[in-house]
Structure formats: C-alpha cells, structure tokens
Amino acid sequence: WLGSALKIGAKLLPSVVGLFQKKKK
C-alpha cells in the first residue's frame, strides 16, 4: 500500500503546491 500511497502523493503534491503559490500571489 505504501507504493500506491506514494504514487497518489506524487500526483497530488504538484496540485497542492500550485494552489498554495496562487494564494500567495
């Protein structure tokens, strides 16, 4: 389950970072 969790995290991380950067600006 750890492998699939990392895959999901890798997919979600860029979206979360993108939203965070948009809110910063």
From Swiss-Prot:
Disulphide linkage map = none
Q: Name one GO biological process term.
A: defense response to fungus
The record's subcellular locations are: Secreted; Target cell membrane
UniProt-listed InterPro entries = Antimicrobial_4
Q: Does the keyword Membrane apply?
A: yes
Function description = Has a broad spectrum of activity against both Gram-positive and Gram-negative bacteria and S.cerevisiae. Has insecticidal and hemolytic activities. May act by disrupting the integrity of the bacterial cell membrane.
Q: What is this protein called?
A: U1-poneritoxin-Ng1b
